[in-house]
Regions:
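Phosphate/dinucleotide-binding and metal-coordinating scaffold of catalytic cores
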Residues: 1-6, 10-341, 345-439
Length: 439
């Protein structure tokens, strides 16, 4: 039987096999296969049932345990969701508490957004990489590296899923979080900067931290404390983001609630976290990038091209697609050059089809400082993608004009941002002529 176990391990080393395929490969009977598998406790994970049964080999080469997966609901109650098993060669099998099983060739798509990334991800790596022997640059982390760090730290990631017993214990035993006042923000900003030694105010990424404000759980973006043309530009862009969100609110379009605060020499923009409900409640938050990777595979396409496919598949609601299209058109007409698939997300309390989350990261990023510190005050002509119809472009143009009007009247914008506002007006004037050609 030991020899048979070796044969099974070799057969499953390259990935799961159906029961019949495994039997044929080993040239044995069904009864012999069943007996052989029974002698391999703790090595095999069964996927599916009956004629659809497949078998996967647990991966003992990756330094990962069997991972308990928990989910927190909107009222703040935590419950087991299942167990995640690493299997050969690089995949995972999720065994839910109800017995359902799913094989993933890599990290399950619904966990991808939990990977540390961006400014906050680099700060996370700064804290945990040395003790775990991981690369200092979080961009070089494998899925295994990311999971190891989250399990060891008990990370509290975006969304409503927690991985491992450390995270579960942290959540259950945590006291009520303390509310932060605006006066605390400069200190929290300094801590955030010190945790990411690679950050520079020149470049297209805004530093941020998470906090509990008097209005609820927030993500807080901030500018550098030192006065400079670059920090002035970022101060203006925080105002621009606030005004874009206010413009959407004014039109009845869901967008993150925001608040501008000037404390000392710094400007802060509070943005509501819509994956948090009350003190402890949570809601699933899934990026377009994650959904595209699992269901479509066209990440370079504009948002509406991807969401149209997702709506057709029943992954998101038709309304989510329609609003995604409007937001993309609006972003195009206000110079938002950063509409990648990670900047659009979906929320859910009960699975598919997912609804679109409130809009976020919507601003005129065409005017953000370059990595070399150049301040741009021009914007490229708007490209009217064919995936959007004329009615959507016309609705977006009305919103975009309202946004520019708000900026032209906004006293918190610096004089140096005036050419940017004028450039947006010219962009919209040219776009209006082309939109008029659409039915």
């Amino acid at each position: 039987m030991d020899n048979r176990s070796v044969q099974i391990r070799e057969a499953l080393a390259d990935g799961p096999l159906a029961s019949e395929a495994l039997r044929v490969r080993l040239q044995i009977s069904r009864a012999t296969l069943a007996r052989a598998l029974a002698h391999m406790p703790g090595e095999i994970v069964r996927i599916g049932a009956a004629s659809a049964t497949r078998y996967a080999l647990l991966d003992r080469f990756r330094p990962l345990p069997e991972i308990a997966v928990y989910r927190v609901n909107t009222t703040g109650q935590i419950a087991p969701l299942g167990t995640l098993y690493p299997v050969r060669p690089d995949g995972f099998v999720m065994v839910q508490t109800d017995g359902a099983t799913t094989h993933h060739e890599g990290l399950p798509w619904w966990l991808i957004d939990m990977r540390p990334q961006g400014f906050l991800g680099r700060a996370f790596a700064h804290r945990h990489a040395p003790s775990l022997g991981l690369p200092a640059d979080v961009r070089h982390w494998s899925d295994t590296d990311a999971l190891r760090a989250q399990l060891a730290s008990g990370a509290d990631p975006v969304g409503n899923v927690l991985l491992g017993e450390v995270a579960r214990d942290h959540f259950v035993n945590a006291p009520a979080p303390q509310t932060c006042a605006p006066a605390d923000y400069p200190r929290l900003a300094a801590q955030a900067i010190s945790a990411d030694a690679t950050w520079s105010c020149a470049g297209g990424e805004q530093p941020k931290f998470c906090a509990l404000s008097e209005t609820g759980h927030v993500l807080v973006k901030f500018t550098a404390a030192e006065a400079s043309p670059i920090s002035t530009r970022w101060r203006d862009l925080l105002v621009a983001e606030h005004l874009a969100l206010e413009t959407l609110h004014g039109a009845g379009i869901a967008a993150a609630r925001s608040r501008l605060l000037d404390v000392g020499t710094q400007r802060f923009l509070e943005l509501e976290r819509f994956d948090r409900v009350g003190l402890f409640g949570r809601r699933a938050l899934i990026s377009l990038a994650s959904l595209d990777g699992e269901f479509v595979g066209n990440a370079a396409a504009p948002w509406p091209a991807i969401t149209a496919q997702l709506a057709k598949l029943g992954v998101i609601t038709p309304e989510a697609h329609d609003r995604s299209a409007l937001l993309f058109a609006f972003g195009t007409l206000i110079g938002n050059t950063d509409m990648h698939a990670g900047n659009l997300s979906f929320i859910s309390d009960s699975g598919q089809p997912y609804a679109l989350s409130p809009a976020y990261d919507m601003l005129s990023m065409a005017f953000s400082p370059t990595s070399g510190g150049i301040l741009r005050d021009s914007v490229a002509t708007a490209h009217l993608h064919s995936v959007l119809d004329g009615a959507t472009w016309r609705s977006a143009l009305d919103l975009a004009r309202g946004y520019v009007l708000r900026m032209s009247e906004e006293k918190q914008l610096s004089p140096s941002f005036k050419p940017c506002v004028e450039a947006l007006g010219e962009l919209q004037q040219a776009a209006a002529q082309n939109i008029a050609k659409l039915h």
